[in-house]
């Protein structure tokens, strides 16, 4: 895992919330002892500000460890409750950028599937709606740009913008693979990818209302990963 400075990750902070650009390769929360993650690093950051007090940090949503992008954390239980309400009521905007090597027939579209998580393998798959444990997953995608790259099986990389309607486990990775557009660098859902590129997925845009004053908060980041290099539209 890469080393990182949590101070460099913080995009915004006030008494209620903390917004970060999570680096790829860093877990939001880790079960491994001694492994740096966003939660422990941010708690250490907060503890330095209030010595002697146990800092509160509410995890509102997550990104897979190999995924980079914007995350919001709550600094009070009240802020956490309000942000969770916005997540549940689908008033939070989440946009992603992804990279694939497969160009779909439709340059834009809506994907709707049912996914089931397998806790034993930490993976999800597309199943029938009546499968026990199945959860509806939907997203919208649109092709942004295509560039040449001899490292991929098709000789190209394709940038895709994705707007999430739901937030299921590994949703984008699973739905895109099922559609025939597996993400580059995805070791779990793209078995045919022989490139050494890291996972091409970034949470690039997050918008919500401030839990205390209702002000619209909007954050955008540019992906830093190798898989995104060369695209002019970033």
PLM regions and their residue ranges:
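RNA pseudouridine synthases
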Residues: 1-234
